[in-house]
């Protein structure tokens, strides 16, 4: 029994170390750009610290560290908000990643190319588990599988580039990237 407990503790420490290394590698990468797909949604994301821009077929979002602009194809509107830290966790990949340690238990396994981190919620949640595929060579997220009672959803990351060159204006609303006539609704 003691050996089983020691193995579980070591596995959790290894998973936490891999997750921490992945997060620190991301933070040190400067401006990061990547493509992604999740179900029928495909797009690109550019991140610089807490700032981000997402351009997808059904959604566009910008966050400059203070103000968030979100365009929804379904409503044809751009909503302008000053999100709280809790709201940022829902849309900002870095904020979401930083909240994982507190909200999930972690375990790790290895394949030839990836560390697989299995995250299970510490409290009751709609999410049963999240499996993160972290590249062994670069500690970069390659894929995430979200499992709920209703099934699973896979997020795939492609064309991951670090130290990308994007101006500060990348993280502010760009009217030219939404259809002409889209209503801007200021909810601040």
Which residue stretches match the model-derived regions?
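N-terminal leader/targeting segments and the immediate start of mature chains
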Residues: 4-42, 46-51, 76, 173-188
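Short, solvent-exposed secondary-structure boundary motifs
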Residues: 13, 34-39, 48-56, 92-101, ...
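Short, hydrophobic/aromatic-rich segments at coil-to-beta transitions
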Residues: 29-35, 48-54, 112-118, 138-143
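An acidic-aromatic
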Residues: 42-91, 148-154
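Short, surface-exposed charged micro-motifs
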Residues: 44, 59-60, 105-107, 129-133
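Flexible, surface-exposed loop/linker segments and immediately adjacent secondary-structure boundaries
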Residues: 83-113
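Gly/Pro-enriched, hydrophobic low-complexity segments
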Residues: 109-180, 185
């Amino acid at each position: 029994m003691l050996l089983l407990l020691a193995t579980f503790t070591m596995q959790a420490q290894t998973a936490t170390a891999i997750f921490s290394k992945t997060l620190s590698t991301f933070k040190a990468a400067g401006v990061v750009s990547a493509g992604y797909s999740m179900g029928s949604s495909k797009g690109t994301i550019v991140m610089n610290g807490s700032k981000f821009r997402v351009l997808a077929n059904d959604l566009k979002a910008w966050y400059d560290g203070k103000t968030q602009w979100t365009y929804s194809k379904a409503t044809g509107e751009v909503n302008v908000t000053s999100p709280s830290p809790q709201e940022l966790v829902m849309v900002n990949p870095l904020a979401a990643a930083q909240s994982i340690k507190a909200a999930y238990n972690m375990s790790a396994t290895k394949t030839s190319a990836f560390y697989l981190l299995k995250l299970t919620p510490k409290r009751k949640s709609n999410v049963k588990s999240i499996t993160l595929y972290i590249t062994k060579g670069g500690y970069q997220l390659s894929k995430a599988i979200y499992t709920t009672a209703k099934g699973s959803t896979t997020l795939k990351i492609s064309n991951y580039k670090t130290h990308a060159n994007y101006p500060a204006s990348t993280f502010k609303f760009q009217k030219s990237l939404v259809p002409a006539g889209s209503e801007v609704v200021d909810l601040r």
